[in-house]
Amino acid sequence: MLGRAACKVLHRHALKNPYRFRGCLVAQKETTRQLATHVQHHLPASADDRLLVDLFDQPGASTSKSSFASTGLFGHPTLTHPGALISLAEATLVRAQLLTERILRARESRDELVKVVKNLDRLSDMLCGVIDLAELVRNAHPERLWMEAANHAYETLCEFMNVLNTHVGLYEVLKVVLSDPSIVKTLSPEAYQTALIFWRDFEKSAIDLPPAERQKFVSLSSDILSLGRQFLENANTPRPPTSIKASHLAGLKDQGMGVRLQLQARFTKKDLQVYPGSLQAQMIMRSAPEEEPRRRIYIASNSSTPEQISVLEALLRKRAELAQLIGRPSFAHLTLDDKMAKTPENVSNFLDALMDHTRPFARRALHTLAQRKQAHHNLPSLPVVQAWDRDFYCPPDPPAPPIPLPPLTLGTVFMGLSRLFRHLYGVSLRPAKSASGETWHADVQKLEVVDENQGIIGWIYADLFARRNKASGAAHYTVRCSRRADDDDEAGDLTLEGEGHRIQESQAFESVKRHRLPNQDGVYQLPLVVLLTEFARPSISRGPTVLEWYEVLTLFHEMGHAMHSMLGRTEYQNVSGTRCATDFVELPSILMEHFLNSPTVLSLFDADSTTTLRATGNNHADPCHSIDTYSQILLAAVDQRYHSPSALDPSFDSTAELANLHNTRGLMPYVPETSFQTQFGHLFGYGATYYSYLFDRAIASRVWSKVFAENPLDRSRGERLRGEVLMHGGARDPWHMVSALMKMPELESGDAEAMREVGKWRIEDEVGISGRH
């Protein structure tokens, strides 16, 4: 419960779980798409928009750094050296312990009972505010001492969170609050939702079990973490090479690589040893006319040792045991309780509907691959398409924009994003000066998020260029959540003799975060997020960073998360911004990718244009996209099967389950001697929720087509999204939000029929990239 995504030590690319005290085919088919022919007017680029271009394209020449003022990380004056972070963690721990004691004493006063939900949220925020900062520092700071200090702070406070997760006293106090109708009546809908989230998370921690069973829960949880760590290490362990005869590489499409490999074989007079995942392996899979080398590489790439399989099956078994310990039939039942899906049966309904929709398209694509294979081998009848044929007969195409575009620099894309947000929400991005010591690297740029009515509503720190010792991939870090702070009643907090300076240190850290917004009651802690990517650095010789289209998609995706954090300003941090259900959190970010399908939106990348003449354009469909989508649906089904009650069956065999699913519901036959499941890392981070990305893709596709496609820059539609979805964070039932946004009251119940309906919605996005979070 109190164990935040900040405590997601094991798999940072997994979907962030919303913990409460948490961290914190024949020739390629061409389709013609009609693009209306009317002129659409849009707002001109502002001076601030244009400054974004210089900020990111000429960072050395920008004036984003202040040469006079100095401070500490994120503007906290004391965080100027690594030891200060350790000191802050210790001060936070003292103050958190005192706040915990205040909550435990709440039964002595009805007035204190009324404040319990607020104080639980304060406690969560107090800890997460440091844990989340430490998580960012240990993933992004270039200096070893800072990373070590961040690890120490992170582990110290996570250890205390783990105590709170199973704290019987806190649970009993919350139970008193929720059992008293007169107190419940005083809670706002948002406060009540926050209380229910705390309650459910306590119950998932076996809080109401006898001591011996609670101890077993702790032991099982520890085993799961340990096995999860081993599983992820195994998933990332390189697979052994396979032996390829040089004679099997004759006729390679990539002639340069083919010649080099054959020369290597002649020189060594040995078969080639090709490592799965290497450039050579990828080239062979895409360009070797002979089937045998592709088959061998496929099998090698999907191989496992018995020990690797054993670790996964032990993890699945321990999860099932933990679920049954607290009265749930399976880990899937336990996990899905507070998700949009609610039950494994509803997930099955969704996946079945999605399979039924996608299967005809996938089979049509597979038939085309079979025709290509037949022609290639001059066969009298259509052959079976095997898994190792996919890339050879249908090489994956990189994502491409729907219309021809000039090279897009990083600054140009940020300018386009700012212009898009101003059209949709009346919000823009503005370069801001950062004081000396405020950022952890010279590359980091600070942006103010500015609302036309309320002024600054949050900050984004953009750390976008690759460097050594920086976390890989793209990620959105919520370093500070939104919440209301003027009703904290700090005066009622307990004190401890001799600890006054530590209490003041923690209070000073929190005071920096607070702001009073125009036209809004109260004082708020404003959100602060960090975007991490690893784009190429601009230079004098190469010029500004030019993004590939997939990188533009990535940036739009992550900025979807960032704007959810900015606009999801709630009174309780536990439900702010992206603090929402796992199977809902990707909706805003995937929807952002859809905007890149619109030439009207793409015209915002031109600073001097205020109109777009939209004419008929051609869109080249990837004929194998449906095969890939179907494969992802199958993986979601595997995830559900692995987390069903069958995981406790003594005869459970993860490889047999995988083979059975492939042979009964897959497109291509299962390949003997393969066991891909040991490399399916999301089985840990996404356990029982891998369907979520598909689910949000389906909803985002329908939201785009029904709400935005006709007029993507329309302010009223943007305000509709903001008012019905983004501003609520996780404070409202996601089904209610989707139902209101789509004007489909039949979805509001979120029942099996609603899940089935979403499964029927065609996933029209050709922009999604699996695994981006």
From Swiss-Prot:
Signal peptide: none annotated. Its EC number is 3.4.24.59. One of its GO terms (biological process) is peptide metabolic process. The active site is at residue 558. GO terms for cellular component: mitochondrial matrix. Residues 1-35 form a transit peptide. Keywords: Hydrolase, Metal-binding, Metalloprotease, Mitochondrion, Protease, Transit peptide, Zinc. Its cofactor is Zn(2+). It is found in: Mitochondrion matrix. Zn(2+) binds at residues 557, 561, 564. One of its GO terms (molecular function) is metal ion binding. Binds 1 zinc ion. Cleaves proteins, imported into the mitochondrion, to their mature size. While most mitochondrial precursor proteins are processed to the mature form in one step by mitochondrial processing peptidase (MPP), the sequential cleavage by MIP of an octapeptide after initial processing by MPP is a required step for a subgroup of nuclear-encoded precursor proteins destined for the matrix or the inner membrane. This is Mitochondrial intermediate peptidase. The gene is OCT1.
